[in-house]
């Protein structure tokens, strides 16, 4: 399988979901990501309301590594990666309560934002 490339993120139309929503864009055929494992991912994050990118590991050319369930990633991102298989690409829509809530970690993310991530699982 060829190396993944940075995806374009298509924000779904309509109202932002109020629950964590995951949709496999590509189903991987490698190991499954489970709590306690260290996942290595590339991702793009945009806000649901504007579709504007607020963060991406692709531009840093450095995958993000985190322990599933370890508290290093926002809750919805962490939960959304669980169950992915290496080689997969998944859209994860994170409601505010599982994202940054009423806080704003950056001017690019207004308080109360629903977040949309497209995540490629590189390894566990």
Residue ranges and their predicted role:
Residues 1-124:
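Cross-family detector of peptidyl-prolyl cis-trans isomerase
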